[in-house]
């Protein structure tokens, strides 16, 4: 019988990471104890409480801990953003490089900014099929449906009802 219990314990040990032969002691302090009182943190907890014991509003906390760290030495405000480093310090060769931006040709500029009406035949050499929006545009608008379609017929019927002088909405009594 003793042998059977030992085999059972061995079987449990092979499946679980708990040693059945070891005796575990209860930890101290227990999580069930009042840890604030045990470690003397109750006065700090009361100073940070949002409500007092009588239910009235306590100290309104700021979103920062500025009030709580004022007694510590040093600066308590964040210094403004970093100042930009001049490009000459980052790459000294930039200052030695010549300015390579050239002026635009005035004639080219005037031709490029001339606004004329588009010819009746459209812009020469321009094909709207190259943009690949022609098919999608007609699908979005519904231009590709003929009037004999199911949806086209419904639209025309609704228009005819409205044209006959009858109100298409129901009147509630």
From Swiss-Prot:
UniProt-recorded Gene Ontology molecular function terms: transcription coregulator activity
GO BP term (any one): regulation of transcription by RNA polymerase II
Region: Disordered, residue numbers: 139-173
Keyword Acyltransferase: no
Compartment(s) where it occurs, according to its Swiss-Prot or TrEMBL record: Nucleus
Keyword annotations: Activator, Nucleus, Transcription, Transcription regulation
Subunit structure: Component of the Mediator complex.
Family: Belongs to the Mediator complex subunit 19 family.
Protein name (record): Mediator of RNA polymerase II transcription subunit 19
Species whose genome carries this gene: Scheffersomyces stipitis (strain ATCC 58785 / CBS 6054 / NBRC 10063 / NRRL Y-11545)
The organism's taxonomic lineage, starting at the top: Eukaryota, Fungi, Dikarya, Ascomycota, Saccharomycotina
């Amino acid at each position: 019988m003793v042998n059977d219990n030992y085999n059972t314990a061995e079987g449990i040990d092979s499946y679980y990471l708990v040693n059945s032969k070891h005796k575990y002691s209860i930890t101290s302090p227990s999580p069930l104890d009042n840890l604030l009182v045990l470690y003397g943190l109750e006065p700090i907890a009361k100073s940070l409480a949002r409500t007092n014991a009588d239910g009235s509003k306590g100290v309104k906390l700021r979103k920062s801990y500025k009030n709580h760290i004022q007694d510590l030495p040093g600066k308590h405000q964040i210094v403004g953003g970093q100042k930009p480093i001049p490009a000459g310090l980052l790459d000294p060769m930039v200052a030695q490089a010549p300015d390579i931006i050239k002026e635009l040709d005035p004639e080219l500029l005037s031709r490029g900014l001339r606004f004329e009406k588009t010819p009746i035949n459209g812009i020469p050499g321009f094909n709207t099929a190259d943009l690949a929006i022609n098919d999608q545009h007609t699908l979005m608008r519904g231009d590709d449906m003929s009037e004999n379609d199911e949806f086209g017929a419904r639209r025309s019927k609704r228009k005819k009802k409205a044209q006959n002088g009858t109100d298409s909405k129901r009147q509630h009594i």
